[in-house]
Amino acid sequence: MNKAISDLSSHTPMMQQYWKLKNQHLDQLMFYRMGDFYEIFYEDAKKAAKLLDITLTARGQSAGQSIPMCGIPYHAAEGYLAKLVKLGESVVICEQIGDPATSKGPVDRQVVRIITPGTISDEALLDERRDNLIAAVLGDERLFGLAVLDITSGNFSVLEIKGWENLLAELERINPVELLIPDDWPQGLPAEKRRGARRRAPWDFERDSAHKSLCQQFSTQDLKGFGCENLTLAIGAAGCLLSYAKETQRTALPHLRSLRHERLDDTVILDAASRRNLELDTNLSGGRDNTLQSVMDRCQTAMGTRLLTRWLNRPLRDLTILQARQTSITCFLERYRFENLQPQLKEIGDIERILARIGLRNARPRDLARLRDALSALPELQQAMTDLEAPHLQQLAQTASTYPELADLLQRAIIDNPPAVIRDGGVLKTGYDAELDDLQSLSENAGQFLIDLEAREKARTGLANLKVGYNRVHGYFIELPSKQAEQAPADYIRRQTLKGAERFITPELKEFEDKALSAKSRALAREKMLYEALLEDLIGHLAPLQDTAAALAELDVLSNLAERALNLDLNCPRFVAEPCMRIEQGRHPVVEQVLSTPFVANDLALDDSTRMLVITGPNMGGKSTYMRQTALIVLLAHIGSFVPAASCELSLVDRIFTRIGSSDDLAGGRSTFMVEMSETANILHNATDKSLVLMDEVGRGTSTFDGLSLAWAAAECLAQLRAYTLFATHYFELTVLPESEPLVSNVHLNATEHNERIVFLHRVLPGPASQSYGLAVAQLAGVPGKVISRAKEHLQRLETTSLPHEQPRAKPGKPAVPQQSDMFASLPHPVLDELSKVKVDDMTPRQALDLLYTLQTRL
């Protein structure tokens, strides 16, 4: 990091100016505008050269020291900024604001913008499919206030959360690229370990000043209308976010219009492990392929894709909203109405982010062209929505209004294919502004004037070799060969002498030069002024335009879910008051799409008579797929979507937990088993009788007895909690749980062997598995044949010595547990087993002594 420089007297004037600005941004890279380049100095230069793979050089000396320097062309800055932002860096943009021609000493410069990962809005720096969120948190271990802002859409929300576990789960859900925390928090807290964590001064979180700034931003007297007046911690966090956004953008933020109070009670909570295991929008390798989002997303707009991702990551418990979405999807499916709407939506584009850039006053000409095209497409879109009877769709259609005046304004203002930036002009149409037209005409018609002037002067002077030209140094000129220069008329004023030629200027040419050269700069200045005025005009309509964008995004998601329902054979789930989870012919929506063979659908029934299924069967038999598909079906139902099942009936759940697969947490110093136990502990502490719990192979990472004991106790606890539980295990001993826990049942995934090869049937059947097929799976995996043969010998010996003599008795109506060897259990010695069955009271002393001698010979 750079160190602040307090004594600037020994530095050059340029470096004095640099350090006055740099001292205010020591922990951020500074791009310092020098002509056509952004130059980067000192420690910033060393860091940037390494990160951007550009040459590190030096720029003279200051204060007796060489100045490390690297630079990038200002017109190519976007690519470099994108790379730095992806690496988590923040960049201060320092521009020249003075005129080099009139400046005495260094040209005036000032910081015009600070680009941070959470406050970027440039299209080139953003992932169009993901929200770009920044969050701030305030509180202690008991209660936290969390504020979340998406500056690229204007979405601003607050909530209060109890405890670290819930806070970390929420941070995992929103996945902010920056997280602001108070500087007076102790070092090393869990939140600080997240990427993008930045400390801010404690007074940035002060409640009263935060309340005041929020009320000013939203033009309200208080925050009661947003339902968060009494959320002291959340208001403090929101105030910090607003301050940070203003600090980085250096402009007003008119697109931030309201604050939404979110409540965890309204949502189905998934912890970090569950989100990871279910691969909602990121797979276990960190990519997007073969995720739920990749299968469910055929949205026509980027803002629709982002909204769908938000829904998948925040399933709801509000029946009114869920049923309104179901009704909307059903309406779209009738007569395939979604097919009429989707092509129209595709014309809309990502106006949500375009409107945010307009609010930030950094919208580019192509943004306005896309907004023009979107507004022009709205009337036809409205026509496509006229026959939608669902009340929610009618409400969305009404909100997605038309804007004929704005569409006409942009049609008149912006050329069909504008340049990327306003910098060099050429954006506004001819006829939009008369003064601009005159200035551009004067500038653009200079060539014809020079042609006409040359012809007139040749005729007037009789000098056939006379030429009229222009260069950037000397401006316009009349050129004569040296031999003819003496014949120049008296009104020719010598301007430049060349080898073999003389150049002149005339009063007429000088007058034209003054007009033409200034016309271009004046035209560019006026075009920029008109462009800024156009942005201000659009800012005045931001509120309804943002409402329209939100309505169109939701229409996109709902029509997309209708298309998915049709093409993926999804059906509408039914929510009921009775506690239950009944799925007929359920399928895994992702696995089904990647299989080359038909997916085997399976049923599930959990209710007040059965709350837990103990699932046994071979590896690769489909246990994990069956469990995950249940969670995904339940989750899709709770976003209002149709689900991959022939039918589905369920009550609302409050949480979805998964304990499926673990790996070492090396950075945190935790083993695989420790990670597994931490996840299990979280489930046992927080699951309720409304939770869905998936437990896969609990207890694998320790000794057999320890693992079995922990798995058994955890299963008993969940059964007694009455959580909806799918408990997959290879501990065959757990199949006796139904004998002691009446809400537990056994099911298994079946398989068969043919010619010493295993065939997985993937069908879920009642009762426990009859055998594990472990050796067959090992053979399928390519374990050497001699190892398999030796394993069979060991297995035969273990089965001979370890089979229990008596199986537990089945309860009436429950299938008997089949006999299966337990290759890990340490069962009693046969002598001890026989001795335990002897009825000593029925024996004579002589019989007892004879038995003792007999048993002794068997030891």
From Swiss-Prot:
In residue numbers, the region (Disordered) covers 799-821
Q: Which CDD domains match?
A: ABC_MutS1 (cd03284)
The regions listed as transmembrane in this protein's record are: none
Binding-site list for ATP:
617-624
State the Gene Ontology BP annotations: mismatch repair
Gene3D superfamilies the UniProt entry points to: 1.10.1420.10, 6.10.140.430, DNA repair protein MutS, domain I, MutS, connector domain, P-loop containing nucleotide triphosphate hydrolases
A GO cellular component term found in this entry reads: cytosol
User: What PROSITE patterns does its record include?
Assistant: DNA_MISMATCH_REPAIR_2 (PS00486)
- The keyword Disulfide bond is assigned to this record: no
Entry's family note: Belongs to the DNA mismatch repair MutS family.
Q: What does this protein do?
A: This protein is involved in the repair of mismatches in DNA. It is possible that it carries out the mismatch recognition step. This protein has a weak ATPase activity.
Q: Could you tell me what this protein is called?
A: DNA mismatch repair protein MutS
